Amino acid sequence: MAAALLPTLSPPVSRAAAAFLLLLRAPAKPFSSLRPPQTLRRFLTSTSSSSPVTPPPALRPLSTVAASSSTTARAAPARRDLLMLGIETSCDDTAAAVVRGDGEILSQVVSSQADLLARYGGVAPKMAEEAHALVIDQVVQKALDDAKLSGSDLSAVAVTVGPGLSLCLRVGVHKARQVAKSFGLPIVGVHHMEAHALVSRLVNKDLDFPFLGLLISGGHNLLVLAHSLGQYVQLGTTIDDAIGEAYDKSARWLGLDMRKGGGPALEELALHGDPNAVNFRVPMRQHKDCNFSYAGLKTQVRLAIESKNLCTDDIPISSASEEDRQSRANIAASFQRVAVLHLEERCQRAVEWALKIEPSIEYFVVSGGVASNKYVRTRLNQIAENNGLQLVCPPPSLCTDNGVMIAWTGIEHFVAGRFEDPPAANEPDDMQYELRPRWPLGEEYSEGRSVARSLKTARVHPSLTSMIQGSLQK
């Protein structure tokens, strides 16, 4: 289907932290007393170069939410009475949820693209976008129906604005603006990786800042020190492939059923293998930092499969001989042991760095899709215990991409007064906004800077934390 021009996003900044809300190329400015500046810049797209400029409404603190255009102003509810709709479409899951301000989950709906993943051997952005567009209306409506609410009952809408796949992000953003415009609701733009970190605060009410976070998924490996809401230090990241990508590719090469997800399929197969059968090398041991690399380990897996003459492309594991199945299980178990050992070594160094910066840290938060892996949790729990920290992992349903984490992060920032006013009633559907597909969460720790040539830096937006710091300096 033809892709319509949908909103892209670029977050403004407040004095307390960056408001990842909707703006376009406007210089960030701090609040002045209780009256915020005009931080939202929008323009109407047109074939004409002389398109009229529409002045935006001001970003306002929570206590002074006002309406745009013909929408009706709403009084600020107490936190427990907040009702946040969260929408997530950053990659291959279409998700929506409604969460109350005190953390009660009223509904959670996820539509998976597992069949597409199996058919195309991974995420095909255009196919994923079309799949999102086909189900987004039903997913959001079911989230409202399951919560026994209508759009008019909501306090605000939170939506993932980055990082992620641009084609996919725009579907969720467009739907969020539709809902917000229809019911006069404020919008909170959410950083996908921050949402993975903060959902643990919904699960564990004792979890407070500062804490160490490990966010592991198909596209991300990220070690961060969370100082406070919106203030993060990046201790380490992946310089090529993330651990989830390595799990998925290895599972595919081993001929596993990808409909249940590559990670879970490989984890299950590894239970039947010898983790020491194949002598895979642990990546990056010569680099004394906290960065990750899984591209080389993927290559080792591929070579191991070829060396054993396993016909994994033609023979799925369900049709393989007993000897063949055992060889595949041994490769899976050996891969998992080394992949997680790489995690352990980097996390141990990150704990040491984090405690040097913030000696008061008590929690080690692990989230993201790979955090659902029981072997990963067991090994990282040992790291936490060895360093006197408490491991906090959300339940598996909140580790993978979901609407709950988006809604909860939206609540945290909405309460802090960081949101955009409802879209104007006359806002056209073909407006264009800047999305943030490459959006760092925090500033890099000086000791963690990598000199690896493959470190991805091109077309990266300024980090959320750098925007906060810039606003405070002004």
Where are these regions (language model features)?
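Acidic, glycine-enriched active-site microenvironments
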Residues: 2-474
